[in-house]
A protein has these predicted regions:
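Short, surface-exposed loop/turn segments at secondary-structure boundaries that line and modulate
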Residues: 79-110, 151-152, 215, 233-254, ...
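Helix-loop-helix junctions that connect adjacent transmembrane helices in secondary transporters/permeases
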Residues: 145-224, 383
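Beta-strand segments within the central parallel beta-sheet cores of soluble alpha/beta enzyme folds
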Residues: 80-81, 230-236, 264-274, 301-306, ...
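Glycine-rich loop/linker segments at domain edges
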Residues: 19, 25-28, 32, 159-194, ...
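Alpha-helical support elements that line or immediately flank enzyme active sites
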Residues: 51-79, 113-133, 194-263, 320-330, ...
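Flexible, low-hydrophobicity surface segments
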Residues: 1-159, 174-177
């Protein structure tokens, strides 16, 4: 005899399946009592940090005149690459991502120096007083620029199955085309922020909004030239991340920690929205080129597909992001004879990074576009192809 009760009625009494379980911080969120990094009590004499950044995308860094910045009211410390005791790098995989630009600037908004002052507004005003002399160099700003120059942050990758050239040549129908999708800012409500508090024996405690505390710990230790176990990183909660705080937070935590180490005082670096959007990576923009062969029923017989992404000036996570775009390029379709070419383009723009989907949406976009184009050529509904 069949039991007519629903699955929820049949579940054990202690089961959490189907049960209403409130989010751990739900009441704090709706009441406004949830604490984020900027809500934490600041130690007495906390310094506030602002960044001086490159105004152009590519150039030779000649001189940095910081005299007016150092003399500005409230300024306690100014830092450049020369003041880093450890490594000037926060690259998560490839070591090509400097904390401060050194000798060359590679994107508009790249940090060149930092100012620490007794008040955040004093630091920001002082940062604007610096004179940075840069000899401009030609800038590659688009995917097309980078492809023409064969400029890549990582070597191209190629995946082939079957004989796509033969399949395309023998296909009864064939179309080719191009497409592009743009990047996207994460626009988390809580911007990038770090509060570094120096401890005993060169130790450092950092409160920050990050998706990867372990990576921040390693990067700060490398920059300060101390052991990783001397760095504690704490993230109570984030006001949004979406991939934008996976690797990007490390640089700002390192700068706050450098100020704290140099002065022996707590240091907070909190980007305003404009600086955040200018100096942090986005979703990767992609350009596509495809050549597809198919039959009268819309069945794909052969495909040659090129995926080229704008990675920015450094590798960051562009390797795995582009790999995943390749892995998702077939989506749910069978491609018997296919060649996929992935180009990870180096441009003089901010280094793009992780974003929800991590390359998957960009990969699936291409094949869904191709399905739509096949349907249009056959005058059929895409759902019938």
């Amino acid at each position: 005899m069949n039991d007519q009760r629903s699955p929820l009625e049949l579940r054990p009494s202690q089961s959490v399946i189907g049960a209403e379980i409130p989010h751990d911080s739900a009441e704090l969120h709706v009441s406004g009592e949830a604490l984020y990094t900027d809500d934490l009590a600041e130690p007495v004499s906390t310094l506030h940090v602002a960044l001086g950044v490159s105004p152009i995308p590519h150039g030779q860094l000649k001189t940095i005149d910081l005299a007016a910045t150092r003399a500005a009211p409230g300024v306690v410390l100014v830092l450049t690459a020369a003041d880093i005791p450890g490594e000037n790098d926060v690259g998560p995989i490839v070591h090509d991502d400097p904390i401060f630009a050194e000798n060359i600037v590679q994107f508009a908004g790249q940090p060149v120096f930092a100012v620490a002052a007794n008040h955040v507004n004093a630091a920001r005003r002082a940062a604007r007083l610096a004179h940075i002399a840069i000899d401009p160099l030609p800038a590659l700003l688009t995917i097309e620029d980078a492809m023409a120059a064969q400029s890549y942050v990582l070597p191209p990758a190629h995946v082939t199955r079957g004989d796509p050239a033969r399949a395309l040549a023998e296909a009864p129908r064939r179309i080719a085309g191009t497409a592009q999708v743009g990047g996207q800012d994460h626009f988390y409500l809580e911007g990038q922020i770090a509060l570094a508090i120096p401890g005993e024996n060169r130790g450092m405690h950092i409160y920050t909004s990050t998706q990867h505390p372990g990576e921040v710990q390693q990067m700060v230790a490398r920059a300060l030239g101390i052991a990783a176990h001397d760095v504690v990183v704490e993230c109570r909660r984030m006001g949004g991340g979406f991939g934008g705080k996976e690797t990007q937070m490390s640089m700002f935590a390192c700068i706050a920690a450098l100020v704290a180490m140099k002065t022996g005082r707590a240091a907070k670096l909190r980007l305003d929205r404009d600086d955040d959007m200018r100096s942090t990576g986005k979703r990767h923009a992609f350009a596509y080129r495809y050549d597809v062969g198919f039959d009268d029923d819309g069945r794909i017989l052969g495909l040659d597909l090129t995926l080229a992404s704008r990675c920015g000036f450094s590798a960051d996570l562009s390797g795995p992001v582009n790999d995943r775009a390749v892995f998702h390029a077939d989506n749910c379709y069978w491609l018997p004879d296919v060649a996929i070419h992935s180009y990870r383009c180096k441009t003089h723009t901010v280094s793009d990074t992780a974003f929800r989907g991590f390359g998957g949406p960009q990969g699936m976009f291409a094949i869904e576009l191709i399905i739509d184009e096949i349907a249009r050529a056959l005058r059929r509904d895409p759902l019938d192809v």
